[in-house]
Structure formats: structure tokens, C-alpha cells
């Protein structure tokens, strides 16, 4: 995980300088955008167009091969009709550049990219109808199936076996769970970790493999109006958590994040599953693991947000967006139990398919 010392902290003047030097563009408008570990800026050059300058934290900037593959994946998806960002080449034809900056902790190297800006509203800001939830599930499954078609000599770098946000890394949460000391929810978190090890890990060989986006959340999905009361997905953002994984991981992550802002979170799973299965039907082992994998993602979000706030207390408001509400959802799902939650999800999915 990145730390406070690795997060970039570029000034307005540094942004305008790097945009001019690397891309030959004069930034007439620059404004910061929210980010968990990195630094993002909206940039509107006087020459025209709209972009996002993405400055990776210095820890992740060491993984050049991973970020290069993420960038190529975005281009691949865009070429196949999915609403992903693309990277603008530098004046020397590179899709990324390693730059030195002193952000208060000595000179460090940060990886910089200029990505196309996708207009739209994050799904977190709208009330999601069952139809848009269905579309989200369908889009998540489509993304994973399209990425299976991508050929690249370095796909092995996406194994990322100890990447803390991978769902296979749930046992690694034991290193961080101490940040929950004194919180009664810690007992639930420990219980979920144990259930993952006992009930999910033995089924991993039965899951279908793919490349996961890994962060299909309500702040990384953009929508735009499609008629008087409808929306359609207009953008998929932030591929920084891409890794080799399993189809069922993407679905679990998607359901968890779509629950966060929902006034009726238990009603989210059904439409998302229905949309997902319209592209990629689940097998028995995947269906049987979905509840625990959703719970695992809630635990990751809660524990890692608490840990990161200790590193970045000034960023607490943004870091805790998901985990504050996720705390209630995690407790409620635990209280209801696997059988009842799965019954609601799969029954609702079946009913949605019959509409």
C-alpha cells in the first residue's frame, strides 16, 4: 500500500509546467479531482480538448510494466466500443512519463499520464434504478470478457499476488485488522476472513479466470441522461487496481459498491446479477461464493480505509466515503446471513429476467 510520503502533491504551477513540457499544451483551466492514492487534475488547454492529468503515487510508479499494461487495456477497450479513457502521447510519442518532483519528502519519481476526460456524472450521485443496475452488471461482465481477447506479452505482470486490494489477498487483512481494535465490527471482519479461507479458497480452482478491472465502483462509473428519466453508462475510470483474477470477483466488487449509496441496498444484487448473467452466467461454485466475496470487499474497504486515514488524516473525508456507509451494510448482511441474502439476490435476478 502507498503511504502519505508516496502520494504526490503537485502545485498548480507544476501541473501547467508538466502539461506544457510533455504535451506542448497550454493549460488554461486546471482543477484538482479526488483520488485515493494518486493525484488527478482536470486540464482544459487553450488549444482545445479536455483531459485528466494523472500523477501516480511514487510507490505504484515503480510498477511501470503494470501501468503500461493498464494503459494499453484502456485503449483496447475503447477500440472495442467500451467507454474507457485513452492516453495522449507525449511530444516524444510515449503514453507515460517518469517525472521527478519534491512533494515535501525529498525528490521522488512519479509516473505521469494525460488521459482523455470523459463527461458525465458519477453513479454515486444518482438514484440507481433497477435498469441502470442491470446495465452496470452487464457492463462489468462485458469488460472482463473483452479483456480476455487482449493479447499482450506482459499480461503476467498483472498476477500481483500480494496486491492488497485483490480478493485473493483477504488473508493479508490480518496484518491491518488491528486498526479496528475496540470496534465491535472487528469480530465480523475476522469472521469473514475465516469464512473466506474455509469456504471460498477451496473453490478457487472452480472459478473462471479473467483480468479484473478490480474497482468497478460508484465513483469510477460515469452516466449521462438518456431520455427524461433514464441514464446510460458513459465512462469507466481508474484501471489502477487491474489484476489477474476471476469473473466472480468482478461481480462481487460491483455489487458491493453499488450497494453503498443505495437507499435499499439489499435490492441491488438482483438486477446486477441479472445484467451480469446476460453476458456471463455463473457456475455453481461461483454462485455459492458470491455472498462471502461481497462481504470480503466490504471488509477490505473498511479496514484499508481506516489504515490509510492514519497515514493521510488530511484526506479522511474522501477516504471514508465508502467505509462509513459500508459499515452499516456489512453488519446488516452479516446479521441476515448467507442463505437469506442469496435467496433475495437470486430470486430478484430471476424476476428481473422475466420482465
UniProtKB/Swiss-Prot annotation:
GO terms for cellular component: cytoplasm. Its main location: cytoplasm. SUPFAM superfamilies: Protein kinase-like (PK-like). GO terms for molecular function: amino acid kinase activity; hydroxylysine kinase activity. It is found in: Cytoplasm. Catalyzes the GTP-dependent phosphorylation of 5-hydroxy-L-lysine. This is Hydroxylysine kinase. It comes from Danio rerio (Zebrafish).
Amino acid at each position: 500500500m502507498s503511504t502519505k510520503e508516496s502520494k504526490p502533491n503537485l502545485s498548480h504551477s507544476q501541473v501547467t509546467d508538466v502539461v506544457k513540457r510533455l504535451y506542448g499544451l497550454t493549460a488554461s483551466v486546471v482543477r484538482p479531482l479526488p483520488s485515493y492514492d494518486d493525484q488527478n487534475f482536470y486540464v482544459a488547454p487553450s488549444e482545445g480538448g479536455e483531459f485528466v492529468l494523472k500523477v501516480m503515487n511514487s510507490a505504484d510508479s515503480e510498477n511501470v510494466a503494470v501501468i503500461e499494461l493498464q494503459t494499453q487495456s484502456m485503449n483496447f477497450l475503447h477500440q472495442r466500443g467500451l467507454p474507457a479513457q485513452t492516453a495522449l502521447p507525449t511530444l516524444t510519442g510515449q503514453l507515460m512519463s517518469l517525472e521527478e518532483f519534491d512533494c515535501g519528502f525529498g525528490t521522488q519519481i512519479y509516473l505521469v499520464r494525460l488521459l482523455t476526460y470523459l463527461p458525465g456524472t458519477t453513479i454515486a450521485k444518482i438514484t440507481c434504478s433497477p435498469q441502470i443496475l442491470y446495465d452496470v452488471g452487464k457492463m462489468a461482465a462485458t469488460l472482463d470478457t473483452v479483456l480476455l481477447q487482449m493479447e499482450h506479452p506482459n499480461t503476467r505482470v498483472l498476477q500481483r499476488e500480494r496486491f492488497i486490494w485483490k480478493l485473493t489477498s483477504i488473508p493479508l487483512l490480518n496484518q491491518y485488522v488491528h486498526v479496528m481494535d475496540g470496534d465491535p465490527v472487528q469480530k465480523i471482519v475476522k469472521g469473514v476472513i475465516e469464512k473466506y479461507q474455509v469456504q471460498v479458497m477451496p473453490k478457487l480452482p472452480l472459478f473462471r479466470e479473467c483480468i479484473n478491472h478490480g474497482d468497478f465502483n460508484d465513483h469510477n462509473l460515469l452516466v449521462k441522461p438518456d431520455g427524461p428519466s433514464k441514464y446510460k453508462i458513459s465512462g469507466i475510470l481508474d484501471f489502477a487496481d487491474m489484476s489477474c483474477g476471476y469473473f466472480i470477483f468482478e461481480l462481487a466488487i460491483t455489487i458491493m459498491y453499488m450497494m453503498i449509496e443505495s437507499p435499499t441496498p439489499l435490492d441491488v444484487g438482483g438486477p446486477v446479477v441479472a445484467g451480469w448473467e446476460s453476458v456471463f452466467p455463473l457456475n455453481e461454485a461461483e454462485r455459492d461464493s458470491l455472498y462471502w466475496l461481497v462481504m470480503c470487499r466490504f471488509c477490505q474497504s473498511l479496514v484499508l480505509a481506516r489504515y490509510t486515514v492514519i497515514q493521510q488524516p488530511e484526506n479522511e473525508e474522501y477516504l471514508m466515503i465508502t467505509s462509513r456507509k459500508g459499515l452499516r451494510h456489512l453488519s446488516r448482511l452479516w446479521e441476515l446471513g448467507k442463505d437469506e441474502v442469496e435467496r433475495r439476490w437470486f430470486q430478484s435476478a430471476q424476476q428481473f429476467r422475466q420482465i
